[in-house]
Amino acid sequence: MSNDSSKAKQNQVDEAVEGEIITDNENETVTGEASLMDELTQANFRVEELEQALEAATAKVDEQKDSVIRAAAEVDNIRRRAAIDVEKARKFALEKFANELLPVIDNMERALQGTDAEAEATKAVYEGVELTLKSFIGTVEKFGLTVVNPQGETFNPEHHQAIGMQPSPDFPANTVMMVMQKGYILNERLLRPAMVMVSQGGAAVDTQA
């Protein structure tokens, strides 16, 4: 009887010990899981911080890239505007210079018109003025100056200025029958219109063009 009682007590002790072991194991498991979760949480926070830092760095790089692109575009614009300004200044200076030369050309042409090319007394003068005029015209043409001499051409109000109209059996209507003063174009821009007399008939001509 005493043996049975001893066995029963021993069993109770064993069960109590096993219960404590199980409890300790469960506590260790819970503690381990909590520690693992804490490590995972910290790792997630770290990943988020790194992602935010990466996004900030990427945004900074994009911003700097945009700044560089804008700066390069602005430099190109400045260069383009400077080139345009230089070209305008060059054309303006050339136009002003050409305008000063036109009266000289007109005077030489009038001198030729008023000089007898066949007379012995004036032949040498005529040839000298003619040669000078041709050389002068050839020089200014190198800089883009073009003579507008529309004798026999259809009246063009963009390049010609009609000073009058006359009936003529020798010219169709609206044809330049006489050039009173030559015109000039500088680099495709009208410097001075040609002063012309236009044949009468057909469509009317705007003499104020």
UniProtKB/Swiss-Prot annotation:
Location within or outside the cell: Cytoplasm
GO biological process, one term: protein folding
Chain's role: Participates actively in the response to hyperosmotic and heat shock by preventing the aggregation of stress-denatured proteins, in association with DnaK and GrpE. It is the nucleotide exchange factor for DnaK and may function as a thermosensor. Unfolded proteins bind initially to DnaJ; upon interaction with the DnaJ-bound protein, DnaK hydrolyzes its bound ATP, resulting in the formation of a stable complex. GrpE releases ADP from DnaK; ATP binding to DnaK triggers the release of the substrate protein, thus completing the reaction cycle.
Ranges where the record places region Disordered: 1-27
GO cellular component, one term: cytosol
Domain of life: Bacteria
Keywords: Chaperone, Cytoplasm, Stress response
Keyword Chaperone: yes
InterPro entries assigned to the protein according to its UniProt record, in alphabetical order: GrpE, GrpE_coiled_coil, GrpE_head
Species assigned in the record: Shewanella sediminis (strain HAW-EB3)
Acidic residues: compositionally biased ranges: 15-27
Assembly with partners or alone: Homodimer.
Pfam family, any one: GrpE
Keyword Hydrolase included in the entry's annotation: no
Gene giving rise to this polypeptide: grpE
Chief location category: cytoplasm
UniProt name for this protein: Protein GrpE
One MF annotation (Gene Ontology) recorded for this entry: unfolded protein binding
Gene3D superfamilies referenced in this protein's UniProt entry, alphabetically: 3.90.20.20, Head domain of nucleotide exchange factor GrpE
Biased composition (Polar residues): 1-13
Family the UniProt entry places it in: Belongs to the GrpE family.
